[in-house]
Amino acid sequence: MSTTSMILTKKNIIILSIIIITIIAYQFYITSPQSFPSSNTITNTINTSGKGLDYTELLNLQKDLKAQQTEIRKQLEQLKYSINDINQNQNENQNQINNEYNNNKLNDEQENNNNNNYNNNNNNNNNELINYKERIKKKSKEQPNTCIPVEGKLLCLPNFIVIGTMKSGTTFLDYYLQKHPQIAHHSKKEIWYFNSYYANGIEWYAKHFEQYTSLENQKLIGEATPFYINNPNTAPRLFTTLKNAKLILLLRDPVERSLSQYHFSIQWLKRNKSPPLEYSFEHLIHEEADVIETCIRGHERYKEAFKQRKEIEKNGGGGLLNDNTSGEEFNLVDPFYTLHSEKNWTFYKDCIRCDKCFQIGSILHTSGHPTFGMLAKSLYFEQLDYWLNFFPLEQIHIIRYEDISSQPESVLSELEDFLDINHIDYGEFKPRNVVQHDPMNQEIKSYLINYFKQSNEKLYNLLNRDFKWQN
């Protein structure tokens, strides 16, 4: 039976009880002791009435009336108990109704809370989904195409690459980056994929890095090959493979870098048991300067002669060259060489392999080490300007080598911001792969300062930054 039906039934009982009480009270009133004559009154009535009523019968009648009165009182008492029971039941019912009301209210509130929680959960889920999409979007923007499925595993490619320069702190930087918990380990620092082993394929390259089974625990992946910056083939290859990878470039005072490379090459020859270097630093510097000048001059004259020949052929002429553009030096650069850009830098690689440019050829190229390039690798503007044909400047983080010695914490902190990884304590900083050598003599030092001056000024203007090198 429902609560409402119970309430209606109790109300009917109460109404009925009131009616019964009224009737009984009326009967009680008419049969109450004051309504019946006492024995003295009856005796007096008998004596005065003269009708001669039987006194015993009157007493019996009075007893019967008293018995009825007692019975009525008992019934009234029972009725009183019944009314109390009814009131108690009514109170209990009311309490039950109140409890049910409160329970219903609590249920409603709980349901509202559940709905709110559900909505909040939905909102949270939606927010998490949005955040997840944003993370995926951000990840796809910063680190796209870095993982490929191969034989049930994910082989991941670098998110960042240290592209140069040689003898400018790349070993130090790679050592401390490998200590960061958010950066994956690689098999070796210099992989040389984009300049020397590109034909081995992308799977060969990917196997040099830490492998993953899912993207959930993926770390940043990087490598450091300082010879990438000075190879004209590297930039287009890297752009084709990892066009959104973050690039890191370390630059050192070009005078000091050139000398450091020379002494490093001597040690390298000893370690590899190669023939010793028979030329002094000064001799190699002047010879390389002649190669660069001859190659560039020959290339410029060849371009001018080529334009003249095309113009003469267009006008129906015989295509003869002017006297001032003829000569053997046009063969210094292969005329069928495919240009990556109009920058002279792209021709340097062919120049250093040309015996006609340099009477003793590429001195250490035949012994397996590219020592040649002490000057060219220090012409930073020419190299960076070429790379900007493929990568925007904001994608390249440039570190001044001299800052590594004076403020290594600041250098790594700025790099962590660039890579979007947490700041950590690297502990004590120690120099890495430092080559000790005697100081440079003043004459060759002055020559190099003057030689690099124009390139340095172009670099400062390009980056809007003064590196405060020797001038």
Curated annotation (Swiss-Prot):
Family annotation (Pfam families): Sulfotransfer_1
Lumenal side of membrane: 34-471
Bilayer topology annotation: Single-pass type II membrane protein
GO MF term list: sulfotransferase activity
Ranges that cross the membrane: 13-33
Residues carrying covalently attached carbohydrate according to the record: N47, N324, N344
GO CC annotation terms, alphabetical: Golgi apparatus; membrane
InterPro entries: NST/OST, P-loop_NTPase, Sulfotransferase_dom
Swiss-Prot/TrEMBL GO biological process terms: defense response to bacterium; defense response to Gram-negative bacterium; response to Gram-negative bacterium; response to yeast
Positions on the Cytoplasmic side per record topology: 1-12
E.C. code: 2.8.2.-
Protein name: Membrane-associated sulfotransferase kil1
Organism ancestry: Eukaryota, Amoebozoa, Evosea, Eumycetozoa, Dictyostelia
